Curated annotation (Swiss-Prot):
InterPro entries xref list: Methan_mark_11 (IPR017674), TiaS-like_TCKD (IPR053870)
Protein known as: Uncharacterized protein MJ0921
Length: 300
């Protein structure tokens, strides 16, 4: 078949014993069926969502037998385990739901696909997909422009592309976070940026050095700063700080306190003015519907 998944990425959080799987489906909205069926069928899956034709699954590490029923629970993930820095994902499904596992062969970042049972027609299909073990790193960036020129969101996106080009990992996401519009120190719209990456473990602590260098070279502001968070999910305290930074002025000391509590690395590039926005961006990096909103439009 010529229809293949474009990429499969598996990020592991060893402390939580969880894996986030991100797959780029070959069809524009075909991933909606996958999200619905996999979540209904798979006890291993804790949460699932779609962004365009990419689907995300957060799974436990382990094995759970699937109770496959046509139409009702037609396909899912049966097993996820880590071995020799590789993530093994076992998919199973009925009819077309079983063929999908085979179509991950040839996808970017997939090392190997082992067909366990050949699917198609009315048959059960089962396959094991193997990817490198990766980890998630989220970078908050703020204050790179001036009132005369520049745009932080554009520079951040360029940096994301440079990271992928350099081979350090995959550029997953770019989130624009609206902050307090009444800030007298703002350039104009008062936003900061969160960039999310899937990174190979050996590059985990090299990523920030690479981004720091690019910001130092390209930032136009004297107050540029970045913040680095290692993990799948920003904490509740990080989210609450970000929401507060939407509502009112906050002090740098509060941002530093949140960073200390959550093992966030703060890196001033040209100054400390951007620390608040950089830390705040991390808290809403995974909350795409909340991130761009003004405080008065958020109902929690």
């Amino acid at each position: 078949m010529s229809v293949n998944y474009k990429s499969v990425i598996a990020m592991v959080d060893d402390a939580l014993n969880l894996v986030e799987i991100v797959e780029e489906h070959p069809c524009p909205n075909g991933s909606e069926w996958v999200i619905y069926q996999y979540q209904r069928t798979s006890p291993l899956i804790l949460s699932a969502w779609r962004e365009g034709n990419k689907h995300h699954f957060v799974t436990k590490i382990g094995k759970e037998k699937l109770n496959l029923v046509p139409s009702l629970s037609a396909a899912g993930i049966e097993e996820v385990y880590i071995e020799n820095n590789r993530v093994h994902i076992v998919y199973a499904g009925l009819a077309g739901g079983g063929v999908g596992a085979e179509l991950r062969k040839g996808a970017k970042n997939v090392l190997e696909v082992n067909i366990l049972e050949k699917g198609g027609g009315s048959r059960l299909g089962k396959a094991e997909v193997i990817t490198p073990k990766m980890e998630k790193v989220i970078i908050g960036i703020d204050d790179t422009d001036t009132k005369e020129e520049g745009a932080t969101w554009v520079l951040a996106h360029e940096i994301g592309l440079e990271v992928e080009k350099e081979g350090l990992g995959y550029y997953l996401d770019h989130t624009i976070v609206q902050l307090y519009p009444g800030n007298p120190n703002k350039t104009q719209n008062c936003v900061s940026i969160a960039l999310s990456f899937a990174v190979y473990p050996e590059y985990k602590y090299k990523l920030d050095k690479f981004i720091k260098k690019l910001l130092k070279e390209r930032s136009l502001s004297d107050e540029t700063a970045m913040a680095v968070y290692y993990g799948l999910f920003p904490s509740k305290s990080m989210k609450l700080f970000a929401l507060k930074a939407k509502k009112e002025m906050v002090k740098i000391e509060e941002a530093k306190s949140i960073a200390l509590r959550n093992n966030i690395k703060i890196i001033p590039i040209n100054g400390e003015g951007g620390i608040i926005g950089a830390v705040a961006a991390l808290g809403l990096a995974e909350h795409h519907s909340l991130a761009p909103k003004l405080c008065e439009d958020i109902k929690l």
